[in-house]
Amino acid sequence: MKFYITTPIYYVNSEPHIGSAYTTIVADIIARYKRFMGYDVFFLTGTDEHGQKVLQAAQQAGKDPQEFCDELAEKFKRLWKELKITNDYFIRTTDEMHMKTVQEFVAKMKENGDVYKGIYKGWYCVPCETFWNEDEVIKEGEERFCPECKRPVKWVEEENYFFRLSKYRDSLLKYYEEHPDFVEPDFRRNEMLKILEGGLKDLSITRTTFKWGVPMKDDPEHVIYVWVDALINYISAIGYGWNDEMFNKWWPADLHLIGKEINRFHSIIWPAMLMSVGLPLPKKVFAHGWLTVNGQKISKSLGNAIDPRFFVKRYGNDVVRYYLIRDIMFGKDGDFSEERLVHRLNSDLANDYGNLLHRITAMIKKYFNGRLPSPSAQEGFDSWLKERFFETKDAYHELMDSYRLTEALDKIWEFIADVNKYFNDTKPWILGKEGNMERLGTVLYNSLEAVFKVALMTLPVMPDTSEEVFRRVSFEEKPSKEHLENWGVLKPGSTVIHGEPLFKKIDAKDFKKVVETVSAEQNAITIDDFSKVDLRIAKVLEAEKVPNSRKLLRLIIDLGTEKRQIVAGIAEHYRPEELVGKLIVVVANLKPAKLMGIESQGMLLAAKSGDTLRLLTVDGEITPGAKVS
């Protein structure tokens, strides 16, 4: 049995955050589960390193794009290692093997009559690397915004190669009808069906305005569209075009795991590309929801990107993994909350699970000198516990096989509650006091066997914790499905280690300290970082509204040695006449940018709370151009 699972490859315009870690952790859990069940698994992840957005990020960092990509790819690799991700391969789209595969794949599409040259006229979102038609963008007066990221799009007119995507609309609809489980969850499938039923337009698949990408094989002035380049990673990594035996073993993929915002690329464009070259389609695309912070999508531009390493350092890798899966229903949007994480740690892990093991091993140490007792004649309550285990085990397999990970953990914790009930209701402490060692031994054996089963079922989610449980019960074999299928795996007479509690609870005072420390560490910058920002006092000489914009004002400011123009989104908070004569704080060494076609030569500073915005100013007269330090 084989199982090929992929994550999206992550864009290297910025460092990894908790959102990208979430997808990769989910994939790792599924991969670990499949290995546990006896599958031969290939788990692929990697980085998407071409495109205009990466080029711009490299330029802003003052680095060569390859050097920039090398550094960020290493950061992703290091993070996955810290999170104990068990991927089998890490692909980079700048790999020579991948780039050659992309060229050959697109050449084959062209040979099959599905690629032609034309003129593209339309909107383009650089942050999303996505083309949009006029009827798809968000309109605010003369401004146009990306329907996905809500940032401004730019009008593009250039000679491109196009993919005949429209040709495959009917074939895709038929495939969706014949394979109702192709895209999950159902509501994501319905979104894709709605797009297909509305008709498809041919897709521009090359760019000529920059060179950071894979050149067309027979027309190197054209760089292949970054999304076409990226999607092909799923087959280039497993041998397409260079290792037929490997490719035939693993393709088609069993599961493409993605975020909902890139569903259209994976569930419409990618299948059409595969149809074009005659390859089978992946078995399933699962589009999960967004991980949000305070209700907002995680984004570097919003300043709410969370570095998962801080939480792993504070709470442990297994705690973070457990929280993300248990608290966020897989497939739907979920909000990351450190307070909820601590609640799950204290309640689910420390109280329900860890304390149960601690109580059992303490009694084995006290009454049986740390040796696992032999079970004897079974009573009704013993049979009930076993029945509950087998019911849980069967439900666990069904839920894990259908990627209902949150529900699988719910079932396990229902069983933990059952084990706690069994332990409490059989009252082993009374059995010990009464000297009923035979019955006590049976209760403690069954209780520890049940906790061992919990460790087996949670092994994909909390590998370190499960390994620690195995160590404490002297289980030295490689864990497998067979150990979960049968009751009575633990060997009587084996050493049972009592040890420290599996999880350390966090009280309210400690939680406050952790939050303050983590916040300080995540936001900390060096004095060298701060010194790079040139903050100056400027005097506003003129102010006016930008035509056709309800948000923007154009300011002429005096910086002492020169006058500059700044465009700022403060029109909803200040009238132009209110600003003239004010002394404000500006970033003077910011790279100029165009807003609504007007060049902004700096950025003013303001504070915002809810709907209130106020400019940063000074409490008295000072010469324009004075440096803020």
Swiss-Prot record:
Residues 529-629 form the tRNA-binding domain. It holds the Pfam family Anticodon_1. ATP binds at K300. Its cofactor is Zn(2+). A motif ('KMSKS' region) lies at residues 297-301. GO terms for biological process: methionyl-tRNA aminoacylation. Zn(2+) binds at C125, C128, C146, C149. Coiled coil: none annotated. Its main location: cytoplasm. InterPro entries: Anticodon_Met (IPR041872), M/V/L/I-tRNA-synth_anticd-bd (IPR013155), Met-tRNA-synth_bsu_C (IPR004495), Met-tRNA_synth (IPR014758), Met-tRNA_synth_2 (IPR023457), Methionyl/Leucyl_tRNA_Synth (IPR015413), MetRS_core (IPR033911), NA-bd_OB-fold (IPR012340). A motif ('HIGH' region) lies at residues 10-20. Its EC number is 6.1.1.10. The keyword Aminoacyl-tRNA synthetase applies. Keywords: Aminoacyl-tRNA synthetase, ATP-binding, Cytoplasm, Ligase, Metal-binding, Nucleotide-binding, Protein biosynthesis, RNA-binding, tRNA-binding, Zinc. Is required not only for elongation of protein synthesis but also for the initiation of all mRNA translation through initiator tRNA(fMet) aminoacylation. Belongs to the class-I aminoacyl-tRNA synthetase family. MetG type 2A subfamily. This is Methionine--tRNA ligase. It comes from Thermotoga maritima (strain ATCC 43589 / DSM 3109 / JCM 10099 / NBRC 100826 / MSB8).
